[in-house]
């Protein structure tokens, strides 16, 4: 795997003292554009993706194995994305679809 596509383990994040406190869960449905900043292991075969939206918000989103990780597992950091968030029948906001629109220079 390309180092630019690395998925950090929880131990690596702790050892490197990576602070993710600025990131919040997405709270609205809609289409957004942003940049992939980092990826980390989650729980129960998931990964967490860290995004900066074009409006400046910092978002954390869990992606699950049954979503085939939406292509994020091997996606390079810095990838510009169009993100489509939806609401489940349980009123949970989730990332339904993603489109690559470019690579940050």
Describe each PLM feature range.
Residues 39-42, 53, 86-88:
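Acidic surface patches and DE-rich sequence motifs
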Residues 57-75:
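Beta-strand/loop nucleic-acid-binding surfaces
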Residues 48-55:
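Short, acidic/hydrophobic/Gly-rich beta-strand patch recurrent on exposed beta strands
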Residues 5-45:
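Structural detector for short beta-strands of small beta-barrel domains
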Residues 1-2:
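N-terminal intrinsically disordered, low-complexity, charge/repeat-rich segments that act as generic
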Residues 86-105:
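OB-fold/S1-family single-stranded nucleic acid-binding modules
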């Amino acid at each position: 795997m390309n180092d630019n596509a690395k998925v950090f383990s929880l131990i690596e994040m702790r050892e490197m003292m990576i602070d993710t406190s600025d990131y919040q869960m997405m709270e609205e449905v809609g289409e957004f554009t942003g940049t992939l900043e980092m990826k980390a292991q989650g729980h129960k075969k998931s990964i967490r993706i860290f995004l900066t939206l074009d409006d400046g918000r910092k978002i954390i989103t869990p992606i699950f194995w049954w979503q085939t990780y939406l292509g994020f597992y091997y996606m390079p950091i810095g990838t510009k994305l169009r993100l489509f968030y939806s609401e489940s029948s349980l009123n949970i906001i989730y990332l339904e679809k993603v489109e690559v629109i470019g690579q940050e220079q």
